[in-house]
Amino acid sequence: MKTKLNELLEFPTPFTYKVMGLAKPELVDLVVEVVQRHAPGDYTPQVKPSSKGNYHSVSITINATHIEQVETLYEELGDIDIVRMVL
């Protein structure tokens, strides 16, 4: 992934992901499971439903230590079957 994030960020730094996916009960657990593999810690994600209730957005903040960690998490979070978008 070619990004300029490395030029913009100074590591270690807090980094928030916003993951949007289908409103399924397992969404939060799947997001936390992926994050735990690359940035172990205690997480309390914020969950917001869409106006029609079909989707949920899950915001989770990690303490990023390097750009590869940030990029890998973008890719792996996006690979979750019920995830539609990662910001």
From Swiss-Prot:
- Tell me which family the UniProt entry assigns to this protein: Belongs to the UPF0250 family.
Organism this protein belongs to: Cronobacter sakazakii (strain ATCC BAA-894)
- Record protein name field: UPF0250 protein ESA_02696
InterPro entries per UniProt: UPF0250_YbeD-like, YbeD-like_sf
Highest taxon, organism lineage: Bacteria
Q: Which Pfam families match?
A: DUF493 (PF04359)
One GO cellular component term of this record is: cytosol
Q: Which residues form a coiled coil?
A: none
